[in-house]
Amino acid sequence: IEKGETKILPLVLDLTNPSSSLGWASQERLSLLERGPADTILALALIHHLAIANNVPLDRIAHFLKSLCHSLIIEFVPKSDSQVQRLLSTRTDVFPDYTRETFETEFQKHFFIERVIKIRSTERYLYLMRGQKT
């Protein structure tokens, strides 16, 4: 790595509607899927937005994230969390499968869970996962 250079690429995008390839012959700016897979993705405060706010099932989230990276650091935010309660305050809770147990079951189809840390003073958990060979 050149001095002062990092290999960190922060991306801000709507994962439920990612941009396609752009530019001449669709080759100047590659789509998110074409850029990867990344070594590691850091996904904090994300899962509840995809699952609760955007109705994306946990199995689809796990499959998609596996297509983007080799390893994953992801935070699970339970329904009891104030931010999830805020998302649910304007709608009926139709998410019986949004549980930590289901999260682990679905993600273990694509990743090995290497470490789980409970975040102090919260009900949130941080997971380190490594992708399974497919």
Positions of PLM-derived features:
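A short, conserved alpha-helix within the catalytic core of class I
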Residues: 20-26, 49-65
